[in-house]
Amino acid sequence: ILALAVISLVGLGLFVMRELQAERPAVNLRLLRNVTFASGTVLGGVLGLGLFAGLFLMPMFLQKLLGYTAVDSGLAIMPRSVAMALTMPVAGRIYNRVGPKRLVGFGFFITALSFWQLSRLSVAIGYWDIFFPQTLQGVGFGMVFVALSTASLSTISKPDMTAATGLYNFFRQITGSVGIAMAASQLTRGGNHYRALLVEGISDYRDKTHAWTQTLSGVLNQQGIEPSMVHQKTLGLLDKVVTQQATMLSFNHVHFLIACIFFAVIPFVFLLRTRVISLETQSGKAAKGEELPWKT
């Protein structure tokens, strides 16, 4: 893994050097000298990370820990998509009125808040414990999508628009893939880590452990389990509970990490500087060759 990481970093460095020196680069990295576009690209990358990582985590959480079927988990995460679809047209309508900074900043804040809420779940939750964070997340994504892409590309000249659009979408797709990989890796590592911590706290000499195993053994005896198998089944059920709780904690950990990332990039919103103008005025000024006004 280390060797592949070194090869990847060297290859990335050579690629960046080549693209910066080429007269007609395949990926025009010079566009990142534009502060508004660069900050918008960073925010768009984090947006892609949260979007894809969240879409990866929630179905796994519902099916693996809560026993949802694929259909039920799809219905459970539907509020996010519905909220996003309803919010995007509204965000487009109020974009010129409130400006991109407020829309994007508030959208990132409530999205981070939704991931923080998801980091506080347990295996004893119900549907509504999922519904409200998912809906809030959809509203946040819906507010950011339209406003961020418009603001990021508004300072790009027309000849560079195609390259800038491709670069913006490229970063968002790449970080989306990174988000899924990061989430999967952290789930595995977190599960092992939290399981080790939980196992350290289990001992026959602890009153809670002893009481739990005695209660469970009594239940198994009442169910007609052979006495010789009771102890083995008790340990098996205890192991299952520990694994379940460790997995739950690892999901919470990943959601918390994503929330921290969203909170951390909010200052980039203040670097957005964009032209905000009605379509009618924009068409008239463009026809006359006049400069479009700036709104920061």
Model-derived regions: residue spans:
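Transmembrane core module of solute transporters
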Residues: 1-163, 271, 275-296
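Hydrophobic alpha-helical segments of secondary membrane carriers
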Residues: 43, 167-171
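Hydrophobic transmembrane architecture of multi-pass small-molecule transporters
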Residues: 171-274, 279-296
